[in-house]
């Protein structure tokens, strides 16, 4: 397995720096509060009020004065995650569309991300959202 278990992706210090930086926007999907104007009845399967359902960590990228790359502004999604209990309830698609709208309003040419080849569900999700491959990273394990 490539990933360590039981560890956080960011330290507390890294997270504070990310949240304080305009170049690394973070978006969080939370369960609606009881007084959000929705008359739908709360049931045991509904998430608790203000519970985090998902998040997207993003980074603005721009390759200025590159010999080979055009000077386009990109919003790179470093991490998009939805709580396992909230998957299948359109949290990811709503969050992704919000990020897409933010990127458009910020003057970005495109939105990019990386997805692990060992995660076909994520690949299928991103394809449903309209993303297409533009770079393929390869490796040979020694």
State each model region's role.
Residues 70-84, 139:
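Conserved acetyl-CoA binding element of GNAT-fold acetyltransferases
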Residues 104-114:
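Conserved GNAT acetyl-CoA-binding A-motif
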Residues 1-17:
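Conserved GNAT-fold acetyl-CoA-binding loop/helix
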Residues 28, 50-60, 76, 81:
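Conserved beta-strand in the GNAT
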Residues 112-122, 139-142:
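Conserved beta-strand-loop-alpha-helix junction that forms the acyl-donor binding cleft
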Residues 93, 105, 117-135:
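Conserved active-site alpha-helix within GNAT-family acetyltransferase domains
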Residues 16-28, 76:
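A short helix-loop-beta-strand connector motif used in the catalytic cores of GNAT acetyltransferases and
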Residues 82, 88-101, 128:
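Conserved acetyl-CoA-binding loop-helix of GNAT-fold acetyltransferases
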């Amino acid at each position: 397995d490539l990933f360590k278990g039981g560890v956080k992706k960011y330290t507390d210090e890294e997270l504070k720096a990310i949240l304080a930086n305009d170049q690394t926007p973070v978006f969080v999907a939370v369960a609606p509060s009881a007084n959000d104007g929705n008359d739908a009845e709360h049931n045991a399967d509904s998430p608790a009020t203000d519970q985090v359902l998902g998040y997207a960590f993003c980074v603005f990228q721009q390759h200025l004065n590159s010999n080979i790359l055009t000077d386009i502004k990109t919003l790179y999604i470093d991490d998009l995650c939805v709580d396992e209990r909230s998957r299948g309830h359109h949290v990811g698609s709503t969050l992704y569309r919000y990020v897409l709208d933010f990127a458009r309003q910020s003057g970005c040419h495109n939105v990019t991300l990386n997805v692990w080849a060992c995660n076909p569900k994520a690949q299928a999700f991103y394809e449903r959202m309209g993303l297409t491959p533009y770079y393929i990273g390869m490796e040979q394990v020694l």
